[in-house]
Amino acid sequence: MKQRTTRFNKIYAMQLVTIFLGFIIFGISENIKGPAIPRIQFDFALNEEQLGSLLSLNALGYLIACSFTAILVRKFGIKATSIMSFASMLLSGIFIFISHAYPAFAASYFLMYIGNGMLEIALAILGARIFVKNVGTMMNLSHFFYGLSSTVAPLIATGMMSVQVFGHVLDWRGMYLVMLSLSLLPILTALRSTFPGDDMPAEQRTPFKELRRDPALWWMVLILSFGVVSELAVGGWLVNFLEKAYRWDTVKASGLLSVFFLLFSVGRLVLGPVTDKIGFTLSLIIFSGFSAICTFAALAGGESWAFLFAAAGLGIAMIYPTVMAFIAKRYPNGSDTAITFTVTMMGLGSVIGNYIIGFVIEAVKKLYGVNDPNALLRGLQAGYGFIGLCALLCAICGFVLYRFLKKRGELI
């Protein structure tokens, strides 16, 4: 009996190492591009439109990967699919390093985002299968590692691009090779692990038609979409807002963004047990509502209340992992399909959301007129107000879902 328990603990430990390393790699691959993009643009002489097209193409690759990963999981199993996603990241690092023509580089970058999309779905499915106790705590702990690597990745990437190896500067190509080669670590742990759920007969799996008829899943799509738009938009717009609206210098504005990410990571590390205690649905309402209140209060209070922009990170950090925990609990036999559908729809929603923010800023600026000195400030306030509105809509959708589930006695 003791031998069986020891073996089980070793298996579970390897599963945890694989998923935690996976989230670290995911955070690295998504966030090393910031320092590299200006150098990539210079080396290939790309204009802003070409650079935008490159990033849009990669977003498309990410969505494509999200859509077919569940099929790979059903056909080959989650272990093989996870290894494939890590391997594609590793290969893309090698191809980026040897790509000196733009078409070859664009194809290599596209492969990286295919791997990125596969990895997001694979990690979510792994979490849903592995974490059967304290689901909220463990989901948030896993995503803490994503937040941690996201915070340090740009700093490491910046430093690594100036490192010399055998008399040659690594630059951005070498940096991508080294950072993405870290994908080898979770490949090794995955090879030594076994994962539950692959042996489940097809007839026991909840079919997509049945999932699609569940209103709760559609509310989850809306909650996740609004939550992720509010989360990701901060990284893209906060520094810009502070520099142009309050005339902060880049160092000071970036410092507040770093505090946002710090609180974001702390929230996932510390508040996970709260979601298990009070329930996932109620947690979604409280945390997204808190983020919305902080954002609107920061806008209303002006520069002296700008610290509340960072405080919003505590609330919005909880949305993604809590939604994954909800799906794992509600659809134990259909979590693969439910996660794939929800994340793919969220991806579409987040692309649309970022376009809307830019549109709102420009529309309000034009409304005030080119000659109005406050036009830019009002436009930026309106755009950032939309970020707060997304958090508020996330809370409202959570409230509607709470009432729906409570009436049916299905609260989670």
Regions found by a protein language model. Give the residues of each.
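Helix-to-loop junctions at the C-terminal end of transmembrane segments
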Residues: A65-I78, G267-G279, I361
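Helix-loop-helix hairpin linking two adjacent transmembrane segments in secondary transporters
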Residues: A101-A104, K133-N134, M138-F195
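C-terminal transmembrane helical hairpin of 12-TM major facilitator-type secondary transporters
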Residues: I278-F326
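A late C-terminal transmembrane helix in Major Facilitator Superfamily
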Residues: N333-G369
